[in-house]
UniProtKB/Swiss-Prot annotation:
Its EC number is 1.1.1.8. One of its GO terms (molecular function) is NAD binding. It comes from Arabidopsis thaliana. The active site is at 285 (proton acceptor). It catalyses: sn-glycerol 3-phosphate + NAD(+) = dihydroxyacetone phosphate + NADH + H(+). This is Glycerol-3-phosphate dehydrogenase [NAD(+)] GPDHC1, cytosolic. It is found in: Cytoplasm, Cytosol. It is an enzyme of class 1 (oxidoreductase). Involved in cell redox homeostasis. Required for maintaining a steady state cellular NADH/NAD(+) ratio through a mitochondrial glycerol-3-phosphate redox shuttle. May function with the mitochondrial FAD-dependent glycerol-3-phosphate dehydrogenase SDP6 to shuttle reducing equivalents into the mitochondria for respiration. Substrate binds at residues 196, 347-348.
Length: 462
């Protein structure tokens, strides 16, 4: 298994006994809260093996995995995903550049298969390499070894905590499957969603469905037991012990003890009650990150152009959240930082850059080899569809007649025309920024904060 608790403790601050004791105390405290008996381990499963889901599982394994009688974690991913030859060759280079990884694989009698894959004599599979600590979407950052399960029923049937590491586009389908295995459950699991994105429903009235709501609807698990963990975070950097903050959002019953349980010296987790704003912002930041990548590529990384884009896109985000919530969390602190880091760096920003540079094209879809699902693409379509409904019309001060809310979001409109209808090229994002008829972003924020356009029906509320 992974390095001992003592080794982990020494890395923290050199105090082996003290830090190890604190970890065990935190684990025992959380186990007591769940009513776990002495010989019944806390069981956590991460569903989905993208970069962040894999890193999240690895962080918990490294923290608590040494207490084997008290803690178990496993990760589920689908079987059958082959590793292509190019990735296998690169993975072999990564392994041989890291003496610690090389020694670990040799010790586990796992090195030879990577040699054979490098030579083209063997096909590796994503679930197979994940057991050795290699996430297919992040092979440059080896993780600790993980217990990988490819049978969904085996993975989740007795889990105390389920971590949703799936894209929002897959969340409902997988959790509907999970619900079949929980029909005989007596205890109610806790679910932590890492997913960013939304679904749009138009009946009986136009409204959005966030991943936590999808999970609640699919499983019947009370919404108080479904929480959202938001950044700012870049998965590889967090695993490499870059200092990071996060927020776990939801009902007080679980968010406060979970924040304490998840907190690490380099990964500080705060708790927050505003589930809606954080989850919606989680989807919106991916939308606007694609545009940020385009602007960066098209302007040769112009700091001025990127700052103009940042001003306009954040004002649109604030406008949209004020449609959804009467008093949304302010776009400040960790919430602003999460937006900033996603626009600065991440797979959605990368996708926008590569599109603008012509190194990838829209016909390749939104699932990219080595990167995984580009969740911002589907989110563009969902937010546009929702905000273009005439039944939600608003009357901005400069308009003489009501218009759909999307008319106050020129960047969102442009991204829709670039990514979804494909009627415009990536250059259109710059044209949208340079439109002389655009209002000061502050005007959009002031209108939003007047509460004049609040639409509770957008969350399916009366």
């Amino acid at each position: 298994m992974v390095g001992s608790i003592e080794a982990k403790s020494l890395q923290s601050n050199g105090s082996v006994h003290h830090i190890g004791l604190n970890l065990e105390e935190k684990l025992d405290e959380f186990r007591r809260l769940l009513g776990k008996s002495e010989k019944d381990p806390l069981r956590i499963v991460s569903v989905g093996a993208g970069a962040w889901g894999s890193v999240f599982a690895a962080l918990l394994q490294e923290s608590y995995g040494g207490f084997r009688d008290k803690f178990q974690i496993r990760i589920w991913r689908r079987a059958g995903r082959a590793v292509d030859r190019e990735t296998a060759e690169h993975l072999f280079e990564v392994i041989n550049s890291r003496e610690d990884i090389l020694r670990r694989l040799i010790r586990r009698c796992a090195y030879l298969k990577y040699v054979e894959a490098r030579l083209g004599d063997r096909t590796l599979y994503a679930d197979e390499i994940l057991k050795d600590g290699f996430c297919l979407n992040m092979v440059d950052t080896p993780l600790c070894p993980l217990k990988v399960v490819t049978n969904l029923q085996e993975a989740v049937w007795d889990a105390d905590i389920v971590v949703n590491g799936l894209p929002s586009t897959e969340t409902r389908e997988v959790f509907e499957e999970i619900s079949k295995y929980w029909k005989e459950r007596i205890t109610v699991p806790i679910i932590i969603s890492l997913s960013k994105g939304i679904e749009t429903a138009l009946e009986p009235v136009p409204h959005i469905i966030t991943p936590t709501k999808m999970i609640h609807q699919a499983t019947g698990v009370p919404i108080d037991n479904v929480l959202y963990l938001g950044g700012p975070n870049i998965a590889a950097e967090i695993y490499n012990k870059e200092y990071a903050n996060a927020r776990i959002c939801g009902a007080a019953k679980w968010r406060k003890p979970l924040a304490k349980f998840l907190r690490q010296p380099h990964f500080i987790v705060w708790d927050n009650s505003d589930l809606v704003t954080h989850e919606v912002m989680g989807g919106l930041k991916n939308v606007y990150a694609i545009g940020a990548g385009m602007v960066a590529a098209l302007t040769n990384e112009s700091a001025t152009s990127k700052s103009v884009y940042f001003a306009h896109c954040t004002s649109e985000m604030i406008f949209i959240t004020h449609l959804l919530a009467e008093e949304p969390e302010k776009l400040a602190g960790p919430l602003l930082a999460d937006t900033y880091v996603t626009l600065l760096k991440g797979r959605n920003a990368w996708y926008g850059q590569m599109l603008a540079k012509g190194e990838i094209n829209r016909d390749m879809g939104d699932s990219i080899s080595g990167k995984g699902m580009i969740q911002g693409v589907s989110a563009v379509g969902a937010f546009y569809q929702l905000l273009s409904q005439s039944s939600l019309s608003i009357l901005p001060s400069e308009e003489k007649k009501p218009v759909a809310p999307v008319e106050s979001c020129p960047i969102l409109k442009t991204l829709y025309k670039i990514l979804i209808t494909r009627e415009q090229s990536t250059q259109a994002i710059l044209q949208a920024l340079r439109d002389e008829t655009l209002n000061d972003p502050r005007d959009r924020i002031e209108i939003a904060q007047s509460h004049a356009f609040y639409r509770p029906s957008l969350l399916g509320q009366p």
